Amino acid sequence: MAITAAMVKDLRETTGAGMMDAKKALTETNGDMEAAIDWLRTKGLAKAAKKSGRVAAEGLVGVAVRAGRGVAVELNSETDFVAKNADFQQLVRDITNVALDAATDVEVLKATHLNGRPVDDVLTDAIARIGENMTLRRLHALEGDTIVSYVHNAAAEGMGKIGVLVALKGDAAKAQEIGKQIAMHIAATNPASLSEADLDPALVEREKSVLSEQARESGKPEAVIEKMIEGRMKKFFEEVTLLGQKFVINPDVTVAQAAQEAGVEVTGYARVVVGEGIEKKEEDFAAEVAKTRAGA
């Protein structure tokens, strides 16, 4: 596979590796970006990299909670201007509240009635009225004894660019207090899972493979290498799992310890970021102006 300058640039931006190292990594892995990241890491030429998932789509995440159930709904728009529109925000609010009743996924939500009509039809009308394409993209529902919500970069009450839900059990008042702090922590740190047991096995295996290769590059005895791998995997679990992470409000304890000290237990969470994983075309403003003038 031909290695292009754009591929090298993307890999450098993702890993911080030098140009020649990035090119060699892509050559060694036949242009496979994820494999190239791992190759650089095994050579100690890149930091552990999370999947890039550039956020490009606009819109809002709406969150709502009622009687032990919470939902986070993502409604995308083409521009941030429309996301600030009062009609659009009311649509997010209405759809989020409808989702609270029983919706379990986006397709169910689209068929659910809002003011006597399917949500999908209401959305079609809004597209025609507001004049911009919109997509009802994701719905996360969470249930538990106590559900706490948090919105980061709020555009209006109950909606913003990042929506978080946390499920807890224990004393309701204490759960509300610590739950809000944990929700803010989740918004900031983006954990991969609640606990080690919930992690994607493929992610764990990939990390272990990279760390094993790194350890063996040291040339130390096998017994020492095994200890190195064990220690590094322990650190990995602490960094990517919610319960294992250092609590941002008080880094002297983990999230699990903070919850335990408050007399509650975290049983689940959801984190939704507007446009997460969607890549939209970057517009060259100067070229766009030139094109417009040429056509005038």
From Swiss-Prot:
Species assigned in the record: Paracoccus denitrificans (strain Pd 1222)
A single MF term (Gene Ontology): translation elongation factor activity
Spans annotated as Involved in Mg(2+) ion dislocation from EF-Tu: 79-82
Keywords: Cytoplasm, Elongation factor, Protein biosynthesis
Stored InterPro entries: EF-Ts_dimer_sf, Transl_elong_EFTs/EF1B, Transl_elong_EFTs/EF1B_dimer, Transl_elong_Ts_CS, UBA-like_sf
Signal peptide (residue range): none
UniProt record similarity statement: Belongs to the EF-Ts family.
CDD domains the UniProt entry points to: UBA_EF-Ts
UniProt function note: Associates with the EF-Tu.GDP complex and induces the exchange of GDP to GTP. It remains bound to the aminoacyl-tRNA.EF-Tu.GTP complex up to the GTP hydrolysis stage on the ribosome.
Name of encoding gene: tsf
Subcellular location: Cytoplasm
Protein name according to UniProt: Elongation factor Ts
Principal subcellular localisation of the protein: cytoplasm
